Amino acid sequence: MISEKNSIYFSNNKNEFFALDERTGVIKWKQTLNSNLRPTYADGLVFTVTLEGYLVVIDSRNGNIVRMTNLFEQIKKYKKNNIKPEGFIVARDEIYLSLNNGKLIIIDIKTGKSKNILKIDNGKISRPYVLNNNMYIVRDNSIIKLN
């Protein structure tokens, strides 16, 4: 859940993604998306990633989907069923998406296409965090700093 420009954006466990008026609680718009990740707001757009690995960019004013891109298209079909997004951040011109298999996908924000896939660990890693222009990821009992 995030709050931005007098709206609250969130998803529920019924494959619904909402924008609510922050003051009244009235639904501004609703989309059918199955995401359990925290969305991100940037330049009038709401970004989220579905459980199937689709990057969804939504116009925050009216709820229209601007773009939907399959981020898992480079992953072999038999592996897709076991891979789930863990979290993502929008930073500069890129989106960083962590996966439950220890990989981090770097995505071009303009095209929605994967630029690179980094193997961070063999298991689950956290959503990326940024502090003082450095990115951090938590895995097992350690914190990894990425440059």
Model-identified regions with their sequence ranges:
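Conserved beta-propeller blade signature
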Residues: 7-10, 46-48, 56, 94-97, ...
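Surface-exposed loop/turn positions within WD40 beta-propeller blades
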Residues: 14, 52, 101, 140-141
